Every structure is written in C-alpha cells, then in structure tokens.
Amino acid sequence: MNPAFHPSTPFIQEEQTLTRRIFEEKRYTVQGHILPRDAFFPMGKRDWRPTAENAARLISEAETILTEDIPTLLATDYASFRRTGDRTVFDRKYQERRKMCLALALAETLEGKDRFTEKLADVIWAMLEETTWVVPAHLSNPAINRGDPERPVLPYAWKGTADYIDLYAGLSGAVLAVSLYFAGGALDRFSPELRKRTEYELDKRILTPFLDRSTWVASGWQGWDGVHPETQTPANNWAPWITGNILTVAAFCEPSLARREEIVSAALPILDNFTMCYGADGACEEGPSYWAMAPGKLFGACELLYDLSDGYLDLFGDPLIRRMGESETLLSVTRRRFLTYADAFAGLKANVGLLARYGERCRVPQMIAFAADRSADGSGAAQDLYSCWDSPYDWLCNLAWEMPQNVPAYQPPTRVLLEDFELFIAREFAESERGLYLAVKGGHNDTSHNHNDVGAVSVFADGQPILLDAGVGTYTAKTFSPERYTIWNTRSDYHNLPTIRGADQKQGREHRAVGFCAGEDSCSMELREAYGDGAGIKSFRRTAALRGGRVTLTDDISLSDAGEVVFHLLTDTKPTDCAEGSFRLHGRLLTYPAGLTMTVEAVEHSAPETARIPVAWGVPTLWRVNLTSAAAKEHHVTVVIQ
C-alpha cells in the first residue's frame, strides 16, 4: 500500500539561528546506538525489494549489460583531462562501470539464478584493479599529488596506501559495498577471494583514510567548522555527499561494532560543518541543480543514519533540515524550468523521488505535492532507473519508493523571500505557466560554484524566458581554474547587469549587494561594492518590481567621472519589432529610454564549456541585447516588460 499523505503545520515562521551544528546541538551519544552489521537492513527492511516495475527494469538492464563490453580505462583516458581539459573521456567510462555493477548486483539478487554473477565478478574485478578511484579532475588536490607542482598526468596511488577520498572514490566504495551486500552469496560461489579482496580495498581506500585525521586539511572537503583553515573556503556538497557514501560502506561492510561507531562519530561533525554554511532560509547557494547534491545528499546521509541507529539519530523534524528541502520547490519557475543561478543547469528536471521522500520523512507537504505534480506530467526525473545512483543508499530508497496517493494539488507561491541568501521572487498569478515571473538575486560573488551575478534578474512571461541566466555549461579544466571568469556564462555582463565604464563585477566575498530590501512586490539593493573601487562608481541602486501586469527594472548609477554604461539583457530569442525605445521578446513589449543605442548579438557558444547551454534552453543560440548610454556622471535607466 502506498504511504498516505500527511499534512503538517507550516514551519516557515519558526525561529532559527543562522549558524547551526545540528547534531552537536542535540547531544547525541553514538556509542550504544549503532546497529551491528547483521542487524542493519536497507530502509530497516530485512526483505528489502524494489517496486515490481523497477525490479523488471533492473532485470532488463542487466540483460543488456550481459551483451556489452566492460569499458576499458586507459592511461591516455586518465591523462586526457591534464592534456586537453576534457573530463568526459575518462569519467563517462568510469561511471558506466559503476552503473553496471549496481544493476548486475541487484538483478542477480532478484533473480537468484547466477545468470549475472560472472559478469558482475568481472566488473568488480575491473574496479578493484583500478590504480585509484579518484578521477583525474580531482588529481590536482595536494593530498593526492603530494604537492607536485607539475600536476601529474597519472595518479601516484600505486606507490602506497590511499590517503585521499574524492566524490568518486566515495561513490565507488558505496557501489561495491551495496553490491557485496546483495550479491555476496553469488560472488562467494564464484570465488570467496572476491569478497575478501573487495573488503580489503574498501578498508584500504575508504575507511582507513577516512579515520586518519591527518589527511583532512589537505583534502579539505570535511569542512573544518564550516570553513577550511587554510583556504577559508566553506563546506559544500562534497561534505554530505562523500560522508553519506562512506557511511554506506561502513553500514554494509564494516564488521566491528566499535569501528562502526567510530566512523559515525567522525561523520557527524562533518555534516554539522555543512549545515553551518546554510542560513535559516535553507537556500542552496550552489544553484538548484546542486540541491540534489547538497541538501539532497545531507538528507540521504540523515536517512542512512536514522536507519543505521534504529531511529535514534533523527533530524527529520528540525526546521532547518525541512527548509533546506522545501527551498528547491520555491525555485521552480514553470513545470519544466527551475530558476538558474550559480552553476544551475537550465535543463534540470525535478528529482521527484528524492523530493517526495524528503517531504514524507520531514513532513513537508509542499514537497510531496510538488513532486507529485512533476511526476504526473512527466516533467520530473521519475522514469530514470539510475536516479540518485551516485549515492547508492539513496538509489535503493528510490527504487523501493512509490508516489503516495491522494496528494493535494501543488500551487506555486506568488511571493518568495529567502532573506539570508538574498533572493526575491514575485509571480503575477499562482500558476506556473501564466503571467509574469520576476526573480532578483543579491548576495555576494564568492559562493560555491560562483557566478558574478549580484543583482541579477530573471523574467519569464507565460512560461517563456524574457530575461534569463544562462546557467552552467560543461565542466572542463578551465571551469575550476583561474580562467573561470573568462567563460562568458560566469560573468556579470551576461547576467542582465551593466558594464560600467568598461568594468564588470569582480569575484570575491567583498563584492556584494548592500542594503538588500524586499517588499511585497519589489526589491532593491546597492551594487557599488560588487564592481569594486576601480569602476569609479559612487552609487548604483537597482530596483525591480512586478506590479500592475508589468515588470519594471530601474538602475540609478552615479559615477565619480563621466563614463559610458552598457546595459546588457540576455534572452533566448532574437528581438522583434525593434523601434527606437522598444522591442519585443516572445510577444512581450520591452521599453527603454529612447536615448540609448541598441545592438543585438548572437552569443558565441562554440567553446566546450558553453556548447550545451543553448541546447538546454531549447534554442540554437542565445541573444544579448546591449543598450548603451552616452558618457555621463548620472545614469537613470528603466526597462519595462509588459
């Protein structure tokens, strides 16, 4: 029977401190509360099984895998990232091995005929023989290259014990742990040595280095009280994501109860380091695409800890955890579009299984209604067999999950204010495909997966983008290098923000909005600091409003010396009906001061970092409208969309 829908009291009004260490607050005692290995079962169910539909899909997937070759990982594949900056050559084949492993293991468990055992043994053996489970894009970390200034092309891990765990090493460990748990008996019939070797590698590559605190400063992802002591970078999605997968290895494979407790005790402060970086509004600064990889991964770790402690470690009622979940639903523009900021992907689909499970556990009805709405019309990712596979415990939960029945209809809010993150959203109607939609972002230019986008606005009309944030493209070596802000989609002049006397916004926490203020239908802020002193800006006040069936964007700029200002507008369609002081986008009229000079350009997207951006928006190219104001000390420009 499907679980019932549970209404709950709205929690948005609850008091909340800004910086919280939730596990520490609750004074949990780990010792004596962690289940031994033989008493732990996925989701607390000894007879865990996927839904009938997913069971059939797993069998079918495994049958297909039987006809396929296991991808070969070559030295030249690993070296390609260092040589060309391309991450996909190695990563695609690497990930395919791990998906094969999971599908074969569960299919063998479901069928029990040894039809998939030998192929599974081959895949596991191939993974065990990999020199390192760390992917080449993360090889530059000092913990794995031992400070080699030349940035090695190939890993050093063959020299001795592993001392670094990245996202993909954690994933690999969890994949093998889950596979061994479910298909261990079949693998033992093939060769008991395979289990022994797998357990040896899991201890060597995952559990032992995790418990060695001497590696933590170099690797950095653990958070260190929220901020890394050397780089001063805050904890991001790596903290809950890797921690959740390490906990999966411990839960399924670690035989010593004392060591299981030690691993959990080490994990809880890391998760607290992550929650310390969230404001009371629960907003994910990394962008909606990273919600599943940040708050979603925290939820997954909490779900595993709940099951591993037989319900003792329970954060599901905490208001911050609930807000972190609900925040994703607040960022939906239409059924098929999320708001893009930071490294958000314009083609993102809602992870309906994760959203609904989060909502059920934390009793947030809005999340369940949102997920059901996206599932019903096919705009969510419910049909993906591998949804959440990069955290295998989450994947198991998703495979066994069914959408609850009799869920009330979802209705988007007409106003959203995330005060700590500084994001204001107004919607003309409580319908996702009707009327005008306005989003305005404040904040600072030093977020995780940062774009220089302080003061950026996004506008939609009847579900169509009028002014947009392009979002993320494809990661390459350049993406996370000093050249990041040479990529156009990260720069302020492609975020509906002006270039002032030739200057655009700068990266850094000091480059931020000041005096962010939101009313019922408008938002304003001072943006001088976002550009820095070199721009010669005395004041730059931006105000955006949605009222009376129109969006009004007003920039008041005062300069120390006369200078030219170019107001940039980014859209997905070429302007039509262009006249002095006006043009149309998707049928909507945009007006601007007639004294400005308008030019239109197709946005270049041939570089590998940006090639997929127009595709995500469903168009051949994006367009940028440039409105140039003559040199002056004072600039007052209002753009109206109606």
Language-model region placement:
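Extreme N-terminal leader/anchor segments
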Residues: 2-55, 103-109
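Solvent-exposed loop and edge beta-strand segments that line ligand/cofactor-binding
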Residues: 29, 34, 85-97, 109, ...
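Long, well-ordered core segments of solenoidal/helical folds
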Residues: 62-73, 120-138, 194-225, 262-282, ...
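Non-membrane alpha-helical segments in proteins
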Residues: 96-110, 122-126, 170-178
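Structural helix-adjacent loops and short alpha-helical linkers that scaffold large soluble proteins
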Residues: 108-121, 179-203, 250-268, 305-321, ...
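Active-site lining segments of carbohydrate-active enzymes
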Residues: 151-287, 300, 394-408
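Carbohydrate-active enzyme catalytic cores, enriched for enzymes
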Residues: 295-467, 518, 525-526, 614
